[in-house]
């Protein structure tokens, strides 16, 4: 029995007809107790106890006042409680893993935020319309907002594993969506403060001289030169925290429930049809002790070691895989970096740019001012685009390479040897096998092979 489960994508967006029939001939002969016993509590982290229950409500500070971009960045870092954020962003300049492009972008949350328009005129108008700066967020911004999906419990029966994986994914996506709704309002508050600071900067540069039209012209010039760059800096910190914090919370809660029920996952066939899904921050199953397939081939231990190295750096629980782990070898190995490949920071930036261009894509307009190309932006149909990196604009490694905006294929999972999939001869039932003495000599070789999936 196999099921195609859409992870971070609608099934209709991708047609995956590949089978999950892979030959790990020793899977059904494994000593389950022996395998699970090797995964001891030494791998547990203090994070597990921190995230053992849902995070409590945490309201954002009042909207920031007009102040310098540096001060706004520092305030945001403190408000999020994310002192390691800047160091993480810097480190991701030297990583190649695509940890973000399989995560949903939630474009619909940004289609009505005019402050994110790629038109300078629209941004300026939205900034002036936002005066005075509000003293509170309405509705309130909860930095620990939760979704409506219930937390999934590890099933007692293997037949329910596929439903469990679906439920784990739905829970994560529900938490992420709920949290991002609040983070988008937080970003808007910082954009307002930044715009008002830039307006004051334009006035100071004119030193009180000039007409209102001269001030407006100067303000638009300052917005064009600085607003997009500074907004992108704030957004990178904000959304990195969103993705990391939600994934940590959900992953460690899943880890706590799965670590004491590992034996059931030996029966699971798990396939990542694209490498970016294996490198993604979120994994619904953390103890993949059954068959594990990456891009049509059995997952190799060195791939597991490399992704676990990154997960450890990000404070995420490691991925365990009993069939491929090698005795006396570490579970982590530092990945090599290539400057010729896209970087992790580029994949994050692509996610952010897609969000921040949503308003202009939904409300197209033609800017009145010529737009210069900046090192932090990319011209798209004459519009100024939000910050990026050179790596994010690189040509793909090959014509067949998976790109961040490509549809995300469904995750493929299957269950090995359940009551429904066990190939029994027509004259046998599970009840008769339990109550009667089974004479294997009366069963043909082909039927025996089918029974034991050989």
UniProtKB/Swiss-Prot annotation:
A Pfam family this chain is assigned to: Alpha_TIF
Taxonomic lineage: Viruses, Duplodnaviria, Heunggongvirae, Peploviricota, Herviviricetes
Main location: virion
Gene from which the chain derives: 12
Cited SUPFAM superfamilies: Conserved core of transcriptional regulatory protein vp16
Species annotation: Equine herpesvirus 4 (strain 1942) (EHV-4)
Quaternary structure and partners: Associates with the VP16-induced complex; binding to host HCFC1 activates VP16 for association with the octamer motif-binding host protein POU2F1, to form a multiprotein-DNA complex responsible for activating transcription of the viral immediate early genes.
Subcellular location(s) of the protein: Virion tegument; Host nucleus
One annotated GO biological process: regulation of DNA-templated transcription
Alphabetized UniProt keyword annotations: DNA-binding, Host nucleus, Host-virus interaction, Phosphoprotein, Transcription, Transcription regulation, Virion, Virion tegument
Protein name as it appears in the record: Tegument protein VP16 homolog
Family recorded in the similarity comment: Belongs to the herpesviridae tegument protein VP16 protein family.
Gene Ontology MF terms in the entry: DNA binding
Entry annotated with the keyword DNA-binding: yes
Function: Transcriptional activator of immediate-early (IE) gene products (alpha genes). Acts as a key activator of lytic infection by initiating the lytic program through the assembly of the transcriptional regulatory VP16-induced complex composed of VP16 and two cellular factors, HCFC1 and POU2F1. VP16-induced complex represents a regulatory switch: when it is on, it promotes IE-gene expression and thus lytic infection, and when it is off, it limits IE-gene transcription favoring latent infection. May play a role in the aggregation of tegument proteins around nucleocapsids during virus morphogenesis.
Gene Ontology annotations for the cellular component aspect, listed alphabetically: host cell nucleus; viral tegument
């Amino acid at each position: 029995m196999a099921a195609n489960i859409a992870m971070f994508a609608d099934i209709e967006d991708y047609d995956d007809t590949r089978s999950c029939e892979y030959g790990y001939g020793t899977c059904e002969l494994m000593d389950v107790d022996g395998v699970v016993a090797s995964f001891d509590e030494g791998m547990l982290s203090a994070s597990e106890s921190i995230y053992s229950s849902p995070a409590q409500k945490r309201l954002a500070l009042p909207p920031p006042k007009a102040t310098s971009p540096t001060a706004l960045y520092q305030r945001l870092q403190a408000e999020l409680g994310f002192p390691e954020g800047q160091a993480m962003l810097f480190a991701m300049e030297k990583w190649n893993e695509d940890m973000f492009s399989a995560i949903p972008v939630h474009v619909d949350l940004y289609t009505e935020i005019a402050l994110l328009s790629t038109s300078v005129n629209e941004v300026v108008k939205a900034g002036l319309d936002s005066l005075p700066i509000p003293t509170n967020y309405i509705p309130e911004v909860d930095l620990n907002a939760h979704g409506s999906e219930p937390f999934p419990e590890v099933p007692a029966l293997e037949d329910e594993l596929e439903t469990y994986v679906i439920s784990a994914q739905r829970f994560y996506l529900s938490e992420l969506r709920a949290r991002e709704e609040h983070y988008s309002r937080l970003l808007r508050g910082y954009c307002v403060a930044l715009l008002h600071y830039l307006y004051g900067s334009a006035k100071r540069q004119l030193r009180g001289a000039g007409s209102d039209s001269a001030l407006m012209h100067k303000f638009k010039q300052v917005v064009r030169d600085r607003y997009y760059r500074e907004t992108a800096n704030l957004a990178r910190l904000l959304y990195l925290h969103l993705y990391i914090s939600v994934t940590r919370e959900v992953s460690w809660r899943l880890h706590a429930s799965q670590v004491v029920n590992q034996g059931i996952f030996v029966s699971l066939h798990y396939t990542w049809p694209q490498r970016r899904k294996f490198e993604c921050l979120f994994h619904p199953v953390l103890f993949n002790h059954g068959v594990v397939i990456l891009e049509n081939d059995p997952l190799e231990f060195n791939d597991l070691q490399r992704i676990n190295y990154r997960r450890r750096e990000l404070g995420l629980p490691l991925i365990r895989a009993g069939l491929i782990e090698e005795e006396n070898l570490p579970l982590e190995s530092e990945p090599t970096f290539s400057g010729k490949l896209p970087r992790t920071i580029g994949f994050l930036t692509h996610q952010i740019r897609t969000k921040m261009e949503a308003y202009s894509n939904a409300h197209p307009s033609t800017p009145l001012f010529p737009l210069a190309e900046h090192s932090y932006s990319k011209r798209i149909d004459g519009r100024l685009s939000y910050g990026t990196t050179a790596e994010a604009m690189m040509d793909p490694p090959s014509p067949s390479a998976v790109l961040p905006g490509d549809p995300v294929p469904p995750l493929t999972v299957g269950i090995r040897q359940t009551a429904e999939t066990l190939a029994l001869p027509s004259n046998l039932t599970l009840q008769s096998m339990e109550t009667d003495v089974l004479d294997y000599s009366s069963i043909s070789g082909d039927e025996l092979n089918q029974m034991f999936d050989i």
